[in-house]
């Protein structure tokens, strides 16, 4: 390929909306172009990167016996309604683009394909003898992101590999899960990115075991917590830990204290000489369920801890046996709309009475109540008195009507002791999620009545797994992880080209002839090579070569008259002058050595 025919347009400066370095470099290097918010065109250089990632994915999944297919992007709403996900994905802040056809039938643009693939399996796989089966696709997906940002990291249209496995029993599902874990590690290593596998929440997909693969980077949107010995890693949404022990209150009879203008934990500590870990913080929230029901929730948590809304959502779903559409804090405006008298925010206790909700126009009239383990473990504590600017001190759980349901709904934090080994402590890193694997169990097969006949002749739902990789995300994550001040440093395996030849002066006949000769030799040997044959200043070509990040650069310049060229390695910028007759052999040897070190 010649640069003169590549439609290469590079930019000196990044657009203002490109916040992180990988986004900036992909725009500046002419890899992607923004069409509108969250929607990008993949230009020729980027498409070559994507195709190479796809090739690696296909090789590894095919080696595991997976079968490639292509599923429709338009999904009928009735399938999603059967699994209970239509409302959650389309109402309120739901992420599914949806529309109606000419006959008024509701359709969604698929962000994920569990419903479609489960229907296909239910109609195609009838016997345990046909199992296991693992189907995958590489497909454009859609998410109606509220705030698209960071280029391909959080976009509204993206490329994803998703796979779905079907099994006769749970043990076989676990075997497939382990096999896909192995395949994912090989895929990411071959793509030249360093990942950390972390325990993760299953979210709206559902299921039992779940694991994310994270590229560690300062620009990562996810906070991951890792033990110093590396034996434990989890997304903060999922992480468990041992918090610092609370300082116990001295034993005293319960008292009522006036707390004027002391509506926060900090104000209470400052004015009353208490510690945050001696106070119970009570939070009121509203859970909006898939059936439209609105359920107030009362949460008690130790004052020095933060609420983990993901854990809370899971506990509410489990307790009510319903999926959540949304979870939000209750405000005074919400109370006004329900026709309720004001709840004494800042002075709420764990025993706030249900009568507060008795006149609610649409909410359930009883709280669902939870206490985090940190609050439950306090023998004596300070809490709100359910009256404005009043608190109770030295109270026990028996003084406030007893313990509600005790659950783990706190955020694990850096510095906490590890749950598996209290001699280890958690440290934090930022991560970019590039892969996620789930053991779905029978959630979708049961909802859609997708059954097979087992060895005993009985009908039962499939056991299922699902496995996703963000293809376009891998490409940008590689840039985020591997760049310098001059531009991108592509891993060899996914670089758009392996070698770029820069002819410093295209009008010099010797340089031009030598550059063309090396180009032809490399192409003949199967090397992916790009020839910069533009009539531009050498400095412009060198800057562009640095920016687009091709791993190896051959510079055909003034030394060509003596039969020598410069060979530059992009990753460390090492340069050597080399005889033009051996540069092809050296490049083939270097590229072959690198490829063999990451192949399986």
UniProtKB/Swiss-Prot annotation:
PROSITE patterns: AA_TRNA_LIGASE_II
Keyword terms, alphabetized: Aminoacyl-tRNA synthetase, ATP-binding, Cytoplasm, Ligase, Nucleotide-binding, Protein biosynthesis
UniProt superkingdom: Bacteria
Gene3D superfamilies: Anticodon-binding domain, Bira Bifunctional Protein, Domain 2
GO terms for biological process, alphabetical: prolyl-tRNA aminoacylation
Enzyme class: ligase
A single Gene Ontology CC term: cytosol
Protein localization: Cytoplasm
Reactions catalysed, as given in the entry: tRNA(Pro) + L-proline + ATP = L-prolyl-tRNA(Pro) + AMP + diphosphate
Presence of the UniProt keyword Lipid metabolism in the record: no
Enzyme Commission number: 6.1.1.15
A Pfam family it matches: tRNA-synt_2b
Keyword Transcription: no
Major subcellular site: cytoplasm
GO molecular function, one term: ATP binding
Protein purpose: Catalyzes the attachment of proline to tRNA(Pro) in a two-step reaction: proline is first activated by ATP to form Pro-AMP and then transferred to the acceptor end of tRNA(Pro). As ProRS can inadvertently accommodate and process non-cognate amino acids such as alanine and cysteine, to avoid such errors it has two additional distinct editing activities against alanine. One activity is designated as 'pretransfer' editing and involves the tRNA(Pro)-independent hydrolysis of activated Ala-AMP.
Record family assignment: Belongs to the class-II aminoacyl-tRNA synthetase family. ProS type 1 subfamily.
Domain notes: Consists of three domains: the N-terminal catalytic domain, the editing domain and the C-terminal anticodon-binding domain.
Assembly: Homodimer.
Protein name: Proline--tRNA ligase
Organism the protein comes from: Prochlorococcus marinus (strain MIT 9211)
Lineage: Bacteria, Bacillati, Cyanobacteriota, Cyanophyceae, Synechococcales
Name of the encoding gene: proS
């Amino acid at each position: 390929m010649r640069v003169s025919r590549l439609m290469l347009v590079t930019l000196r400066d990044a657009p203002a909306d490109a916040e992180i370095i990988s986004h900036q470099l992909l725009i500046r290097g002419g890899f992607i172009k923004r069409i509108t918010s969250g929607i990008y065109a993949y230009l020729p250089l980027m498409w070559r990167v994507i195709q190479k990632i796809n090739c690696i994915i296909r090789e590894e999944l095919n080696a595991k016996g997976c079968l490639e297919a292509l599923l429709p992007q338009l999904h009928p709403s009735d399938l999603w309604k059967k699994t209970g996900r239509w409302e959650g994905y389309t109402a309120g802040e739901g992420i599914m683009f949806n529309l109606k056809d000419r006959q008024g039938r509701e359709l969604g643009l698929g962000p994920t394909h569990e419903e479609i693939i489960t229907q296909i399996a239910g109609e195609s796989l009838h016997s345990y003898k046909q199992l296991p089966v693992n189907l995958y696709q590489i497909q454009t997906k859609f998410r109606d992101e509220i705030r698209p940002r960071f280029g391909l990291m959080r976009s509204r249209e993206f490329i994803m590999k998703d796979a779905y496995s079907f099994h006769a029993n749970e043990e076989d599902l676990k075997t497939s899960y382990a096999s896909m874990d192995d395949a994912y590690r090989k895929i990411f290593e071959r793509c030249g990115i360093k990942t950390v596998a972390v325990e993760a929440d299953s979210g709206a997909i559902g299921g039992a075991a779940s694991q994310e693969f994270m590229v560690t980077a300062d620009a990562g949107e996810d906070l991951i917590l890792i033990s110093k010995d590396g034996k434990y890693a989890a997304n903060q949404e999922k992480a468990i830990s041992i918090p610092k022990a609370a300082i116990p209150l001295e034993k005293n009879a319960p008292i009522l204290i006036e707390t004027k203008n002391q509506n926060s934990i900090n104000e209470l500590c400052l004015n009353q000489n208490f510690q945050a870990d001696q106070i119970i913080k009570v939070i009121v929230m509203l859970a909006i369920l898939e059936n439209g029901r609105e359920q107030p929730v009362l949460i008690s948590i130790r004052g020095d801890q933060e609420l983990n809304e993901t854990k809370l959502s899971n506990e509410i779903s489990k307790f009510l046996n319903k999926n959540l559409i949304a979870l939000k804090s209750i405000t005074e405006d919400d109370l006004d709309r329900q026709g309720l008298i004001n709840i004494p925010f800042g002075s709420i206790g764990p025993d706030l009475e249900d009568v507060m909700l008795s006149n609610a126009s649409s909410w359930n009239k009883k709280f669902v109540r939870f206490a985090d383990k940190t609050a439950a473990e306090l023998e004596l504590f300070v809490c709100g008195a359910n009256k404005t600017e009043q608190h109770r001190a030295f109270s026990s759980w028996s003084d406030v009507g007893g313990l509600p349901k005790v659950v783990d709904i706190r955020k694990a934090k850096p510095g906490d002791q590890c749950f598996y080994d209290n001699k280890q402590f958690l440290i934090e890193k930022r991560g970019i999620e590039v892969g996620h694997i789930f053991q779905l169990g029978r959630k979708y097969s049961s909802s859609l009545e997708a059954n097979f006949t087992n060895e005993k002749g009985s009908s039962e739902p499939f056991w299922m797994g699902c496995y996703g990789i963000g293809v376009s995300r891998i490409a940008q994550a590689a840039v985020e992880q591997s760049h310098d001040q001059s531009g991108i440093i592509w891993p060899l395996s996914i670089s758009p080209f392996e070698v770029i030849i820069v002819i410093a002066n295209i009008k010099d006949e010797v340089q031009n002839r030598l550059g063309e000769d090396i180009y032809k030799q490399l192409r003949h040997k199967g090397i992916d090579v790009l020839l910069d044959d533009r009539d531009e200043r050498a400095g412009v070509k060198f800057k562009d070569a640095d920016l687009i990040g091709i791993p190896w650069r051959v510079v055909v310049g003034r030394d060509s008259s003596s039969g020598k060229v410069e060979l530059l390695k992009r990753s460390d910028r090492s340069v050597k002058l080399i005889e033009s007759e051996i540069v092809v052999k050296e490049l083939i040897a270097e590229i072959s050595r690198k490829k063999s070190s990451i192949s399986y």
